[in-house]
Curated annotation (Swiss-Prot):
Function noted in UniProt: MFS-type transporter; part of the cluster that mediates the biosynthesis of a highly modified cyclo-arginine-tryptophan dipeptide (cRW).
Name of the protein in its database record: MFS-type transporter avaK
Species name: Aspergillus versicolor
Record-stated family: Belongs to the major facilitator superfamily.
Intracellular or extracellular location(s): Membrane
Amino acid sequence: MTDRRPTIMDKAKKQWEVMALNSLLILFTNFAIFLSMPPQTEIFEDIICSKMHSESALHPQGEDDGCRGALVQSELARINGWKTTFEALPRMLLSEAWTRVVCIYSDVLPLSLVWLSGLLRSVGGGEPVIDSIMCVMVMDVFEESDRAVALLRLHSVFIVAKIFAAPASAALVALTSAWTPFLISLAMLFVAQALSFLLPETLGYVEQKEPDDSRAHKMAGKKGNLNQRFALAARLIVQNRNMAPIIIVNLVASITKSSNHFLLQYSSTKYEWSYSQSNLVLVIREASSLLTYLVLMPAASKAIRRVSSKSVTAQDKRLCQGSGLLNVFGFFSIALAGTPVVYVLALAFLSLGSGFDTAMSGFATSLVQPDQIASLHSTAATAKSLGGLVAGPLFARLMQVGFELGSGWLGIPYIAAGLFFITVLVAVCSIRIQSRSLDEDGQPLLQTDV
């Protein structure tokens, strides 16, 4: 049986298949997750509050003993923070079911058992690995010039899921109880799990588009045992001096991203909103993020290309730097917001930097050889997972410090996030853009352009 090079129609069909199935998977998974977030936080708070009050019957109740008091909120931050950490050890269907089992039987099971959900995520690797797989699939079937647009479209689906999940969750809580969206989301995750089995195989698709002699050369390079493959991955990290700052960017950016998990509790406590109200306010950020992805990021990219005579990779670097600056200003603005109006404006401003991850993914991809893309993204996924391990307890502790010091200090986690993103910017600026040529053995010779 002979291989044939795919036609334009074959290529378009494969691209449509990858985009459609990944979009559905993203939509169902993230709609389910964000549908359950406000009710889950409310259920956690109720469980903590009832446990604390039942265990301290002789303790006179004061202002600090209410469910929105510092004691309950500090414990809620601790539970959510460490839950995030154990989830980074990683996730999916079984862990979500386990979280619901602990909540249903909270009268006999301590709430801290939700931390074990992370152990059930160890099969498969969790969200970073899923994100990495989706990214590699896009890289496999799209040309370099079309990859950024494809990734932006996929992330737009992610944002759309968050936008529609918030009002749906609020409506279900208002009409029934927090348990209704909490359990419906689990059923949606089963649907998403079923969709994952339909994802097409894209490995080798790029090689099919190349001439036979080029494909034979690449396939020869793929032969070898597992040790050789690990050696190649290690060689990429050691020989490509840009890998160190790329790893730092993914590690630290994932830490700052985890601060978003506490926005619901932060805004609810600081401005005395219900969790459903806080989640609806966060929709403003998601709507602004969608505008950023669909309009502002492409417009900024075109503007940079129009005024800059540097390489496309250098222009992508400028896009990452600009997006990073917006994140720094956004986090500081959230931390210092004194009124709900200023807070909403700060959320909208932070959303202007929401394209950083996608921009950085495309920028980093352009810095390696095509056959090193998978190694690059798996390394990035590992760095993000490690960042998730640190972020949960770190931001939980910062939230607790804020509660201990008083409402004026609740923004401490977001001051820290802004400082972390300054580190990200320094790492991005340290990346050197290099032109590539091949030596006699087909290995890249790196020459500095910028």
